């Protein structure tokens, strides 16, 4: 199964008391494949995606991604903290880069300390700069602006609790896309848009 980005073998799903949602599903996806799952309401499309995302693990059979694959999943009703702003939600996708930048600023300041351990600081600086380089962290604000513009997000300072369903969905989609998953699963991606 290693040649496939994702494989399912004889997957089934039963919910109590004895309601069978999926039966004997076998699928394999090549890297780069674009797949749509079509079916009537209640036919198990969302259940299938939750299984693929690893959210639902109580299944019959086997379902697994290729080792090292990062899966991004946008459910029909994405979870976004209503107390946060649009920017805060979107920045969750790049928290590792933002944290590395904040720590790097602390490292730069630590060089000025009289008892600074230059070797340790230089090693940490190299590690943090590698994180920033890998994620194009020096252009992070530009990346965020481009993504927000492309998805027509509300203003950065808008609170999630005041957004429409479609706006919340676009904010969650932006966060997901910026997290750069290897495999993207979108459940009813055009709902509310």
Predicted regions and their residues:
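ABC ATP-binding cassette signature C-motif
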Residues: 1-193
